[in-house]
C-alpha cells in the first residue's frame, strides 16, 4: 500500500507516538513514551539527553533492530522516503525487506565500533560487502570504493588498512571505519549514534564537516545522537531534548542554545565544560553538578594540592612499542607500526598526567604497555622502584592489584555471560581480598559511588546503556583500591552530567587515597579540568609536556595549538573554519622493518615545560 500522500514532500522520515518498552521480571518497563518527530531532506536533527534517556533505543527502533533484543515497539506512524522516492511504513516491513532498507536507504553508525565490526573479516571486506550488496558492484569496484571512503574519513595508509582486522586498529580508527561503511551507500537517512565519541578533536572536526558535505551532496537527512553540546552547536539544524524517555523540548539550534525553555535543557547547557574555564587556576577543579531541581550553575570550591613530593610512583624511560606487519607470499614481516617511540615521563602519587593526541598517536598503546598488555621492545617501566618490564608473570599478576586499567570500549571489556556484580567482584576474588558477604557490600558501595543502584548488580551488560556500562568498568577498576589507574577514554562515552559526577569521584578518590591517574583522552575541556600535567603525543612521541597551565595557556608546539583550535564550542553562531578533508598529506607511523625513526629532542621553555625542538620538529611533522 503506497504511503506517499502521508509524508510531507520535504520530509524523509516521520514518526508519530513511538512507544518502546522492555519486559523485566514479568513487568513492562517503558523506555520511550509518545515520541513524535520528523526529519526533512538535507536536515540534521540532533537528539540529546543523558545516558538512559531513550536516545539510542529510538534509533534502534527506527532500524527495526529492537525486536531481536526483546523490545516492544508500538508506533502510529513510522514512514521513510527511500532513495527511489518511494515511501514505506517501516513497521510493516518483513525481516527480508528490512535487509534491503538497512544500509541502502537508512544507515546507522553505532556507538561502540569494536562490537559493531566483524573480527574475522578485514576492514576492506566489510566495507566492500555493503557496497556490493546495495550497489551491484563487482569485488574490484567495491574495493576501490572502499579505499576511497577510507580516504574520505581521513585514515592514513588507507590501502594498508583495507587488509587489517578491527582488533589491529585504535578505537578512533575503528570508529572512522564504521563511518566509512555507513556512508558508502549514500543512504537517504543516516542515524549517527555518538559517531565522534571515540575520535580526537581534529578528526572529529573533519568528520563533522565530511558528514555535512555528503549531506549536502545527497540531500541526506541526518539524525545525530550525542551528549556533546559543542558538536550539537556545530552540526545541528534542529534539536530534540529527551529526558527519561520523553521529549521535553524541541526547536531550532539557535532557540535551544539562546532561549532554552525547559529546566532540563538549561541544566544540560550549564553542565557543558568550557575550554579556558581553568585559566589562572593551579589545581584540578571539580565539575559543578547540575540537577533538574537546581539548574543554576555554581562553581565548586577550589581543590587543594594532592601531589605528593618525593619519588615518582611510576617512571617511564625511552619506551618503544612496535607492531609487525606481514605481507607477501611467505607472510614475512616487512614493515612495522612504530606505535610508541622513546617515550619518557614520570607520574607522582596524587597526580593526574593526561596523554592527549589524535587517534593512532600512541596514547592507548602507551597505557597498555605500562601493564604489559602489549609487549614493548625497549625502555624501562619502573613502579615503586620495581621494573615492570622484566617481571615474571606471577609477580606481574600481583602488581596489577596496584595498577588498574579502565578500557575505552566498555562493552568489549565486560563478560556478557556475567552479571555486573560478578564482574566487579572478580578482581577481589582473584586476589583473595574479601569474603563473599563483604565483597557484596563492596559492590553495592561501588555501584552507588559511580551513580548506579545496588540492585543493578544482578543485571547483565546488555541491559545497560553505553554510558552506564562505562560506569560499571570504572567501579570494577576502583574495587582493589589501586595506587595508579590508567584511564583510556574513561569518560568519553558519558553524557555531561554523569561525566561530571565521574570526574568528581576520581578527584575525591585521589584526594582521599592519593591515587595517581594516567588519563588518556581526546576531550580537551575535560583534560583541562582534571589534569596537573599534560603530555601531547604525535606519531608515537611526546612533542610537548608541561603543567596544565603551561600547555593550555601558552601552547608552544604547532600540533598542540592545532588540537586546541579544533575543540567544538557550544555556540551555534560562532564562525567555524573550513577544513581540508583529503588524507594524502597525513603522515604515517608505518616504516620498513629495521628502519629507525629519529627521536624528537625536547627543550625546556619554562619551569617543567618541554617542547620538541624546531630543527627536529620539522622533520618529525613531515614524516
From Swiss-Prot:
Its main location: membrane. InterPro entries: AAA+_ATPase, ABC_transp_ATP-bind, ABC_transporter-like_ATP-bd, ABC_transporter-like_CS, Oligopep_ABC_C, P-loop_NTPase. It comes from the Bacteria. One of its GO terms (molecular function) is ATP binding. ATP binds at residues 49-56, 357-364. Keywords: ATP-binding, Cell inner membrane, Cell membrane, Hydrolase, Membrane, Nucleotide-binding, Repeat, Translocase, Transport. One of its GO terms (biological process) is transmembrane transport. Pfam families: ABC_tran, oligo_HPY. The keyword Magnesium does not apply. It is found in: Cell inner membrane. SMART domains: AAA (SM00382). Its EC number is 7.4.2.10. One of its GO terms (cellular component) is plasma membrane. Residues 15-269, 314-564 form the ABC transporter domain. Gene3D superfamilies: P-loop containing nucleotide triphosphate hydrolases (3.40.50.300). It catalyses: glutathione(out) + ATP + H2O = glutathione(in) + ADP + phosphate + H(+). SUPFAM superfamilies: P-loop containing nucleoside triphosphate hydrolases. It is a peripheral membrane protein. Belongs to the ABC transporter superfamily. Glutathione importer (TC 3.A.1.5.11) family. Part of the ABC transporter complex GsiABCD involved in glutathione import. Responsible for energy coupling to the transport system. PANTHER family: GLUTATHIONE IMPORT ATP-BINDING PROTEIN GSIA (PTHR43776:SF15), TRANSPORT ATP-BINDING PROTEIN (PTHR43776). This is Glutathione import ATP-binding protein GsiA. It comes from Shigella flexneri.
Amino acid at each position: 500500500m503506497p504511503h506517499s500522500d502521508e509524508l510531507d514532500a520535504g520530509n524523509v522520515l516521520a514518526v508519530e507516538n513511538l512507544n518502546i518498552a522492555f519486559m523485566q521480571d514479568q513487568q513492562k518497563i517503558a523506555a520511550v513514551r509518545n515520541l513524535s518527530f520528523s526529519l526533512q531532506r538535507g536536515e540534521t536533527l540532533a537528539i540529546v539527553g543523558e545516558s538512559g534517556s531513550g536516545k539510542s533505543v529510538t534509533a534502534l527502533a527506527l532500524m527495526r533492530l529492537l525486536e531481536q533484543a526483546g523490545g516492544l515497539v508500538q508506533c502510529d506512524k513510522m514512514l521513510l522516503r527511500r532513495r527511489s522516492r518511494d515511501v514505506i511504513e517501516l513497521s510493516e516491513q518483513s525481516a527480508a525487506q528490512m535487509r534491503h532498507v538497512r544500509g541502502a536507504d537508512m544507515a546507522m553508525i553505532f556507538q561502540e565500533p569494536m562490537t559493531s565490526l566483524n573480527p574475522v573479516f578485514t576492514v576492506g571486506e566489510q566495507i566492500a560487502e555493503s557496497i556490493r550488496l546495495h550497489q551491484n558492484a563487482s569485488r574490484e569496484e567495491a574495493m576501490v570504493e572502499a579505499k576511497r571512503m577510507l580516504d574520505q574519513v581521513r585514515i592514513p595508509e588507507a590501502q594498508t588498512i583495507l587488509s587489517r582486522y578491527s582488533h589491529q586498529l585504535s578505537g578512533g580508527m575503528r570508529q572512522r571505519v564504521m563511518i566509512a561503511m555507513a556512508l558508502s551507500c549514500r543512504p537517504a537517512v543516516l542515524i549517527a549514534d555518538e559517531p565522534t565519541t571515540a575520535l580526537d578533536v581534529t578528526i572529529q572536526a573533519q568528520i563533522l564537516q565530511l558528514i555535512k558535505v555528503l549531506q549536502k551532496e545527497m540531500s541526506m537527512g541526518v539524525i545525530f545522537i550525542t551528549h556533546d553540546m559543542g558538536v550539537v552547536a556545530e552540526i545541528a539544524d534542529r534539536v530534540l531534548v529527551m529526558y527519561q524517555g520523553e521529549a521535553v523540548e524541541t526547536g531550532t539550534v539557535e532557540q535551544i542554545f539562546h532561549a532554552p525553555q525547559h529546566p532540563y535543557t538549561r541544566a544540560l547547557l550549564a553542565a557543558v565544560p568550557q575550554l579556558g574555564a581553568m585559566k589562572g587556576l593551579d589545581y584540578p577543579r571539580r565539575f559543578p553538578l547540575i540537577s533538574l531541581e537546581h539548574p543554576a550553575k555554581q562553581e565548586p570550591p577550589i581543590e587543594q594540592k594532592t601531589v605528593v613530593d618525593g619519588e615518582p610512583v611510576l617512571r617511564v624511560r625511552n619506551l618503544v612499542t612496535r607492531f609487525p606487519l606481514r605481507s607477501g607470499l611467505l607472510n614475512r614481516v616487512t614493515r612495522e607500526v612504530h606505535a610508541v617511540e622513546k617515550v619518557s615521563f614520570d607520574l607522582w602519587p596524587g597526580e593526574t598526567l593526561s596523554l592527549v593526541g589524535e587517534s593512532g598517536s600512541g596514547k592507548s598503546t602507551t597505557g597498555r604497555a605500562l601493564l604489559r598488555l602489549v609487549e614493548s621492545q625497549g625502555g624501562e617501566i619502573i613502579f615503586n622502584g620495581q621494573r615492570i618490564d622484566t617481571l615474571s608473570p606471577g609477580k606481574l599478576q600481583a602488581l596489577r592489584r596496584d595498577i588498574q586499567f579502565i578500557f575505552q570500549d566498555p562493552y568489549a571489556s565486560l563478560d556478557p555471560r556475567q552479571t555486573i556484580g560478578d564482574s566487579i567482584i572478580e578482581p577481589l576474588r582473584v586476589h583473595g581480598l574479601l569474603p563473599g558477604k563483604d565483597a557484596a557490600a563492596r559492590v553495592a558501595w561501588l555501584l552507588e559511588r559511580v551513580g548506579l543502584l545496588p540492585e543493578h548488580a544482578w543485571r547483565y551488560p546488555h541491559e545497560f546503556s553505553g554510558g552506564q556500562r562505562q560506569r560499571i568498568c570504572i567501579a570494577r577498576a576502583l574495587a582493589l583500591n589501586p595506587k595508579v589507574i590508567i584511564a583510556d577514554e574513561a569518560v568519553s562515552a558519558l553524557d555531561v552530567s554523569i561525566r561530571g559526577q565521574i570526574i568528581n569521584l576520581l578527584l575525591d578518590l585521589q584526594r582521599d587515597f592519593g591515587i595517581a591517574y594516567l588519563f588518556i583522552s581526546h576531550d580537551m575541556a575535560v583534560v583541562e579540568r582534571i589534569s596537573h600535567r599534560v603530555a601531547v603525543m604525535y606519531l608515537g612521541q611526546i612533542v610537548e609536556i608541561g603543567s596544565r597551565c603551561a600547555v593550555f595557556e601558552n601552547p608552544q608546539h604547532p600540533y598542540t595549538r592545532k588540537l586546541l583550535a579544533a575543540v567544538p564550542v557550544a555556540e551555534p553562531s560562532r564562525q567555524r573554519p573550513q577544513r581540508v578533508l583529503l588524507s594524502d598529506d597525513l603522515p604515517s607511523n608505518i616504516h620498513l622493518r629495521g628502519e629507525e625513526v629519529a627521536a624528537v629532542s625536547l627543550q625546556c621553555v619554562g619551569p617543567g615545560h618541554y617542547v620538541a625542538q624546531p630543527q627536529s620538529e620539522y622533520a618529525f611533522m613531515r614524516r
